């Protein structure tokens, strides 16, 4: 392998989460029964005219900004002409000549090293119908036909399966944080076509590429690329020809299977879409499209706050969770992250719910932490109180009083109680000079027992120490 350089290019198809399709008013719902969300425009019925979904354009601008791209000042659509059963119109509306974004880049951090991925273009287009097998027959679900998607095309500069899977994962995270797609590979809302080739080191000429499709997980992306690299390497060292083909990854057998041979470049006879006029994008409109904090920015902010690495990954992979976490206004982010995950997220997991579905208000968590900080409740109380915050409409003070969880911090009261315990247990207390820790624990245990665990442990420990040291000095 040392004699050959791996060259990988990736095309990602990212379905956008708009409420309706790109060019028709048909709603989008992944869970809907097959062929129930189909409009005459989706099927190309005569006399139908497309109407552009504005939100799809906005989502395209968001992604272009996130990928540091040059955004075109005009939106042009083109027809890609070909026949296939999943394309009833006989053409796909896409952006061949004037993509919405060009010349971008994305920096990855892999094993503490930065890797820059060059992105050639992103363009908007409509999705095709979904093909599936049912009762040994091929069926088509046209619910997917017309869903807006963005195709993201890298330059052939990716060097390994690890870089490739990291890049796809970063695009997935960006899409989630921008809230433009659910980016689920298992559902097909994020699909990646991988082009792999090898060439001798020092050569400027690209080798014959092999395309890999049907990859439904990041793990399969790595496996498929590594298999293809190994196959091409063996052919090259044995002076065998590499044929340009399209392959798919057979997950069951963990092998690559050839789908079809690419004998020549297909002529799609692109031409401008006659039914959609050119859309001018004013700079003011582009400037008003704001993007959320990106994954690397969010990661850096959490790292600076000393949040656990595992928690950081969970937050970055779940924008809904990170948005909820960030609403909690508390300076010690490390402390709140430990409580947030060990108590709130753990409680949600037990109930098979998302943490946000518990309806625990961020302000209630803040108030609870203030009570803990001020010594009004203990850590044990906090653990007991978290479940009570689910759907809570009461003030925290009211909740504490109802459940008798406010700690006793009155020093006069606690001192009197401690003196009573010492007087009633003089024999044990007399052992203080020989067994200070044992005597102290005994008195504190008795105090907690007499106050039903309400004595403030910090204040109580301090008072017991002061009283005993004064008595035996």
Curated annotation (Swiss-Prot):
Pfam families: GatB_N, GatB_Yqey. InterPro entries: Asn/Gln-tRNA_amidoTrfase_suB/E, Asn/Gln-tRNA_Trfase_suB/E_cat, Asn/Gln_amidotransferase, Asn/Gln_tRNA_amidoTrase-B-like, GatB, GatB_Yqey_C_2, Gln-tRNA_amidoTrfase_suB_CS, Gln_synth/guanido_kin_cat_dom. The keyword NADP does not apply. SMART domains: GatB_Yqey (SM00845). One of its GO terms (molecular function) is asparaginyl-tRNA synthase (glutamine-hydrolyzing) activity. Keywords: ATP-binding, Ligase, Nucleotide-binding, Protein biosynthesis. Its EC number is 6.3.5.-. It catalyses: L-glutamyl-tRNA(Gln) + L-glutamine + ATP + H2O = L-glutaminyl-tRNA(Gln) + L-glutamate + ADP + phosphate + H(+); L-aspartyl-tRNA(Asn) + L-glutamine + ATP + H2O = L-asparaginyl-tRNA(Asn) + L-glutamate + ADP + phosphate + 2 H(+). One of its GO terms (biological process) is glutaminyl-tRNAGln biosynthesis via transamidation. Allows the formation of correctly charged Asn-tRNA(Asn) or Gln-tRNA(Gln) through the transamidation of misacylated Asp-tRNA(Asn) or Glu-tRNA(Gln) in organisms which lack either or both of asparaginyl-tRNA or glutaminyl-tRNA synthetases. The reaction takes place in the presence of glutamine and ATP through an activated phospho-Asp-tRNA(Asn) or phospho-Glu-tRNA(Gln). Belongs to the GatB/GatE family. GatB subfamily. NCBIfam families: gatB, PRK05477.1-2, PRK05477.1-4. Heterotrimer of A, B and C subunits. This is Aspartyl/glutamyl-tRNA(Asn/Gln) amidotransferase subunit B. It comes from Mycoplasmopsis pulmonis (strain UAB CTIP) (Mycoplasma pulmonis). The lineage of its organism: Bacteria, Bacillati, Mycoplasmatota, Mycoplasmoidales, Metamycoplasmataceae. The gene is gatB.
């Amino acid at each position: 392998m040392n004699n050959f350089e791996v060259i990988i290019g990736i095309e990602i198809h990212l379905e956008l989460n708009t409420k309706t399709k790109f060019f028709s008013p048909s709603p989008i719902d992944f869970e809907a029964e097959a062929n129930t969300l189909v409009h005459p425009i989706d099927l190309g019925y005569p006399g139908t005219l497309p109407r552009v979904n504005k939100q799809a354009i906005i989502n395209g601008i968001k992604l272009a900004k996130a990928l540091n791209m040059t955004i075109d000042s005009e939106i042009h659509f083109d027809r890609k002409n070909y026949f296939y059963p999943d394309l009833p119109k006989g053409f796909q509306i896409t952006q061949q000549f004037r993509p919405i974004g060009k010349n971008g880049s994305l920096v990855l951090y892999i094993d503490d090293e930065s890797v820059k991925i060059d992105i050639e273009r992103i363009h908007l287009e409509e999705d095709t119908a979904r093909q599936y097998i049912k009762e040994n027959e091929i069926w088509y679900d046209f619910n997917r036909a017309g869903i807006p998607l963005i195709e993201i095309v890298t330059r052939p500069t990716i060097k390994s399966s690890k870089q490739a899977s990291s890049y796809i994962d970063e695009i997935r995270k960006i899409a989630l944080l921008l809230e433009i797609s659910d980016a689920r590979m298992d559902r097909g809302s994020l699909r990646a076509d991988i082009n792999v080739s090898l060439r001798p080191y020092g050569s400027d000429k690209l080798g014959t590429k092999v395309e890999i499709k049907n990859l439904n997980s990041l793990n399969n992306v790595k496996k498929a690329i590594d298999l293809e690299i190994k196959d091409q390497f063996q052919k090259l060292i044995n002076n065998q020809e590499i044929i340009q083909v399209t392959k798919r990854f057979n997950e069951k057998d963990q092998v690559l299977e050839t789908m079809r041979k690419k004998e020549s470049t297909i002529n799609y006879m692109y031409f401008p879409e006659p039914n959609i006029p050119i859309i001018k994008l004013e700079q003011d409109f582009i400037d008003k499209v704001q993007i959320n904090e990106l994954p690397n920015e969010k990661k850096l902010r959490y790292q600076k706050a000393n949040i656990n690495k595992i928690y950081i990954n969970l937050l970055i992979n779940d924008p809904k969770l990170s948005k909820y976490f960030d609403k909690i206004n508390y300076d010690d982010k490390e402390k709140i992250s430990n409580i947030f995950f060990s108590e709130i997220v753990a409680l949600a997991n037990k109930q098979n719910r998302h943490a946000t579905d518990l309806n625990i208000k961020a302000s209630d968590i803040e108030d609870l932490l203030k009570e803990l900080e001020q010594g009004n409740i203990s850590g044990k109380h906090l653990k007991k109180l978290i479940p009570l915050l689910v759907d809570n409409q009461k003030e925290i003070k009211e909740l504490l009083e109802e459940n008798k969880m406010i700690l006793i911090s009155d020093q006069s009261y606690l001192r009197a109680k401690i003196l009573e315990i010492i007087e009633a247990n003089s024999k044990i207390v007399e052992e203080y000079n020989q067994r200070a820790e044992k005597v102290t624990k005994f008195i504190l245990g008795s105090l907690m027992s007499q106050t039903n665990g309400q004595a403030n442990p910090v204040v109580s420990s301090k008072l017991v120490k002061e009283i005993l040291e004064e008595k035996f000095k």
